[in-house]
Swiss-Prot record:
Belongs to the tetrahydrofolate dehydrogenase/cyclohydrolase family. PANTHER family: C-1-TETRAHYDROFOLATE SYNTHASE, CYTOPLASMIC, C-1-TETRAHYDROFOLATE SYNTHASE, CYTOPLASMIC-RELATED. InterPro entries: Aminoacid_DH-like_N_sf, NAD(P)-bd_dom_sf, THF_DH/CycHdrlase, THF_DH/CycHdrlase_cat_dom, THF_DH/CycHdrlase_CS, THF_DH/CycHdrlase_NAD-bd_dom. This is Bifunctional protein FolD. Disulfide bonds: none annotated. The gene is folD. One of its GO terms (biological process) is L-histidine biosynthetic process. It comes from Bacillus licheniformis (strain ATCC 14580 / DSM 13 / JCM 2505 / CCUG 7422 / NBRC 12200 / NCIMB 9375 / NCTC 10341 / NRRL NRS-1264 / Gibson 46). HAMAP family: THF_DHG_CYH (MF_01576). One of its GO terms (cellular component) is cytosol. It holds the Pfam family THF_DHG_CYH. Its EC number is 1.5.1.5, 3.5.4.9. Catalyzes the oxidation of 5,10-methylenetetrahydrofolate to 5,10-methenyltetrahydrofolate and then the hydrolysis of 5,10-methenyltetrahydrofolate to 10-formyltetrahydrofolate. It comes from the Bacteria.
C-alpha cells in the first residue's frame, strides 16, 4: 500500500479562494478585514512565518499591518501596543508572533488581546468556548488539521485518535476538536512509558513534537491516517516532519507531506478567523 497524499496546498488554495470572495462581499458593505501582526526580535523562523502571513492575507484582500520591534522592547510597551489595536476598529484580528523574548510573559500577552480579536484562538475565554464546543475562534493549526481530515471524507466519529505532543498550540487543542467530533482521543508525550503501544492502535495519528523523523513505520497501524505537524530543518538544509515520510507512506492510507501538508492550512485558518471577526462587526 502506498498512502494517498493529503495535499494541504490544494485544500488551502480552495479555502483561500472562498475567503477572497467573502472579503469582496464585506468590502461592498464598507468593511475591510484587518489583521495586525506584532513581531518582537529577529528570529529567522518567525520572520519567515510573518512574511508568509502577509503574502497570503494580502492575496485574499485582507488589510495587513506589521509592527516589528527589536528584542529589547519591553512587556509594558508591547501591552500598550495591543491596547491600541484592541481599540482600533480597522483591525479585526491581532496576532503576536510567538515565541517571545524571555523577558516578556506569553500568557500576559495572550490574555491582553481582546477575545473578540484573538484570531490565534489562544485567549483563555476562547479556549474555554472550544472545550465546550461553542462557536469561537479555533487555534489555526488544529482547525486546519480538522479541515484536512474532513477533506479525506473519513468519518471521525468513533475513530481511535492518538496525538503525540501536548502543547497548548497544537497537541491539546487538536485532541479536543477531534473529541468534539466524537473521536476517542489518547495523548502521548515525553512521560508516556510506551508510545508505540499507543500509536499502533491509532486509526488517526497526529504527531507534533518538533523532532525530525521521530515516528517510524513500525509504530504505525496498517492503513492509518497520519498527520505530520512537525517542521524540522535537517543538517543538509532540507525540511523534514516528525514522521519518517518515506517509511510511513508505505504503511498509511493517507499522509500529510512536509512541507505542503498542515503548514498552508495554518495561515489559511488565520485568514478564516480574521474574516469571521470582521463579519461579526456587521452581524453576518
Amino acid at each position: 500500500m502506498t498512502a494517498t497524499i493529503i495535499d494541504g496546498k490544494e485544500t488551502a488554495k480552495e479555502k483561500r479562494g472562498q475567503l477572497a470572495k467573502e472579503v469582496e462581499e464585506l468590502k461592498k458593505q464598507g468593511v475591510t478585514p484587518g489583521l495586525a501582526v506584532i513581531l518582537i526580535g529577529d528570529d529567522p523562523a518567525s520572520l519567515s512565518y510573518v512574511r508568509g502571513k502577509k503574502k497570503a492575507a494580502e492575496a485574499m484582500g485582507i488589510r495587513f499591518q506589521l509592527d516589528h520591534f527589536d528584542a529589547s522592547f519591553t512587556e509594558q510597551e508591547l501591552l500598550e501596543v495591543i491596547d491600541q489595536y484592541n481599540q482600533n476598529d480597522d483591525f479585526h484580528g491581532i496576532l503576536v508572533q510567538l515565541p517571545l523574548p524571555d523577558h516578556i510573559s506569553e500568557q500576559a500577552v495572550i490574555e491582553r488581546i481582546s477575545p473578540e480579536k484573538d484570531v490565534d484562538g489562544f485567549h483563555p475565554l476562547n479556549v474555554g468556548k472550544m472545550l465546550l464546543g461553542e462557536d469561537t475562534f479555533l487555534p489555526c493549526t488544529p482547525a486546519g488539521i480538522v479541515e484536512l481530515l474532513k477533506k479525506t471524507e473519513i468519518d471521525l466519529s468513533g475513530k481511535e485518535v492518538v496525538v503525540v505532543g501536548r502543547s497548548n498550540i497544537v497537541g491539546k487543542p487538536v485532541g479536543q476538536l477531534l473529541l468534539n467530533e466524537n473521536a476517542t482521543v489518547t495523548y502521548c508525550h515525553s512521560r508516556t512509558a510506551d508510545i508505540t503501544a499507543h500509536t499502533k492502535k491509532a486509526d488517526i495519528l497526529i504527531v507534533a513534537v518538533g523532532k525530525a523523523n521521530f515516528i517510524k513505520a513500525d509504530q504505525i497501524k496498517e492503513g492509518a491516517v497520519v498527520i505530520d505537524v512537525g517542521v524540522n530543518r535537517l543538517d543538509n538544509g532540507k525540511l523534514a516532519g516528525d514522521v519518517d515520510f518515506e517509511e510511513a507512506k508505505e504503511k498509511a492510507s493517507y499522509i500529510t507531506p512536509v512541507p505542503g501538508g498542515v503548514g498552508p492550512m495554518t495561515i489559511t485558518m488565520l485568514a478564516h478567523n480574521t474574516v469571521k471577526s470582521a463579519k461579526r462587526t456587521i452581524q453576518l
